[in-house]
Structure formats: structure tokens, C-alpha cells
Amino acid sequence: MPSHFLKVLAHGTTKLDVVYTNESREVPFFLEQLKEKWFHDTMEHEKFLGLDLEYTADQCGVAVIQLCFARHVLIFQWARSDKHCPELMDFLHSGITFAIVDIRNGKLKMRHRFGIEIPAGCLVDLQTVFRLRHDRTSMAHMAVALIDEEYGDMKTSFPKSQHKLWEKAPLDPINIEYAAKDAYVSYELYRKIRVVNYGQRHLEEGGHSDSDE
């Protein structure tokens, strides 16, 4: 299946540049593009990627891997590929920081299906760094609080039946949109959290005084 290049509306007027593919041989080129965009002309507190996973119908394996930097998203349908992409394995283990919402089950599935684990210090579970009322705040609640109120129904508006179709090729447009938004939200949540932390670094360094205002 040839790669698809699409525009996906994330929220408001924010549009994502999305590449969707199940061809392993095409992934290295897109990864290099993402890495260049990650590495060059980027503030230190923005050097990371958003990561998200979608699972097979039996929930036992990874069907789709999504990576996001800024408004650039790669959707790789692992379940319909030849499952041989050493460049992806190297990329995930290269020391780049990845932000994801709730990786507890994903870590096991990545280990069993890929035979690889992202280094512990390079994988940030956003549910452990940002909390609202509950210990593990949902992606939708975080997105409403930090990005846009439009994300309030980002999970409930996606038909449950579509969750069983992540192995279908090509993916339905609604699945592509859902996958792209998930990856973008993972990236954008962590970006906003890091911007705030970066802006408050002086409070930890020297404390706060009226002269700062």
C-alpha cells in the first residue's frame, strides 16, 4: 500500500501534517525527517516526540504506532507491515524522549512484540507528571485543561466498533484522524507542561521575590 499524506484538523484551526504507511521500507525516511525537525531549530525544552499506540482486536499486540513532533505525525500500521523495521527499533532506543499517556500495558506489548523497551529515562508517562482530580487523569481531561475544550469528547465520540479495526488496511479515515490526534495530544500536552516548568525554573534556582513581577 502506498503511503498516504493527509491533513487532519486537530482543533480550531490547528491542522496536522500526517503520513500514514504500512511499508517498513518507507519508515526510515519519515523518521529521519521527524528527527531533523526535532533536532534543528528547537528549544531544549521541546526536544521530544509524542508517542501513542493502538492495539490489535484481541488487545494482545500493537497494531499501530504513532509518532508526533509539533504538527507532524507518522502513523505506522505495524500489524499490516512485514514487521521488519530495524530503523524504527533503533529510533525508539536512540535516547530521544517520548511522551505518552498511560504506557503501563503498552510497555509489555512493545517488549513482547518488538523485543525492545524504550529506556526508562526516555519514556514519560504523562499521567505521572500531570494530575487533576484523580491519580491517573485521562488524556481527554488533560487535553481539555491544557489544549482546547474541543477534546472533551475525543474518546467518547470514536465508535467502539472502530477499535477493532486497527489491523484493517487501509485504515478508515476516522481511525487515521483518531490516531493522529492521539499522537498530537501526547506531544502537545508535554510541550505545554515543559514550557510552564521551563518558565518557572527561576523559582527553584533562586526563589520568588516581588522584584520578579
Listing of model-derived features with the role each one plays in the protein:
Residues V144-S211:
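Acidic, Mg2+-coordinating catalytic module of metal-dependent nucleases/exonucleases
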Residues F48-C60:
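Short acidic, Gly/Ser-rich segments with clustered Asp/Glu that frequently serve as metal-coordination loops
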Residues R113-L123:
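A short alpha->loop->secondary-structure connector
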Residues M1-L49, S81, L126, Y184, ...:
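N-terminal accessory regions of nucleic-acid-interacting proteins
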Residues A57-V73:
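A short alpha/beta connector and helix-capping loop motif
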Residues H72-L92, I96:
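Nucleic-acid-processing active sites and adjacent nucleic-acid-binding tracks
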Residues V124-D148:
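Short alpha-helix plus adjacent loop in nuclease-associated cores
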Residues T97-I103:
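Acidic beta-strand-to-loop metal/phosphate-binding motif
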